[in-house]
Amino acid sequence: MTSLRSTVWRALPTAATVVLTVIIGPSAHADALSRGTAAFDRGEYARAAQDLSPLAARGNPGAFGRLGFMYEHGFGVPQAYPAAFDLYCRGATRGDPFAQAMLGLMYDKGHGVHHDVIQAYKWLNLAAARSQGRAREAYLRFRDAVASKMSRDEIIVGQRLALSWLPGVLVNGRLSGQ
C-alpha cells in the first residue's frame, strides 16, 4: 500500500502538468494569437511576426494568413512570394477566411503563382462564405471584381470548385477542388 501511495504521489506532478497544459495551453495560444493579431492590426509587423511565427509552426490557422500577408508585402519580414503562397495555402486549407481571400488575390494578381481567375474566384467565394460583416463585404467586392474579368463558363467552374472544396483535404497533392 505504501509503495502504491508513493507511486501516486510521484506521478502527481506529471499528471498536474498534463492537465494544466490541456487547460492553459489553448488559452496561451489564443493570447499569443491575440497579441500577434493586434500587432499586425497596428502595423507592428516585426512584433506580429515574432508572435505569429511559433503559432504557424504549430499549425494555428489564424497565424498563416497574417504571416503570408507580411511575406507577400515584405512587412516585418523579407518579401517572399513563395513563402506567402505556402502560408496562405496552409491557412486556406484549414478554413481561415483571411488566408482564403489573400490566396484568391494572389491568383488574381499572379504574385508568386500563375494568374488564374478561376482559382481566384473560388478562394474569394469561400472566404466570403466563411466571413461576416465588413470582411464579407470586402471579399464579395474582390470576388465580383475578379468575376468581371471572367466568362460565364469560368464563373460556373469557379462556383463548382468552391462547392466541392472540403477543408484540409488534399487531392493528388493539390488543394481540394483544384
Segments (PLM) and residue ranges:
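Bacterial N-terminal signal peptides that target proteins for export
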Residues: T2-A16
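N-terminal signal peptide c-region/cleavage motif recognized by signal peptidases
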Residues: G25-P26
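Terminal, low-structured helical/coil segments at or just beyond the last alpha-helical repeat
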Residues: A135-Q178
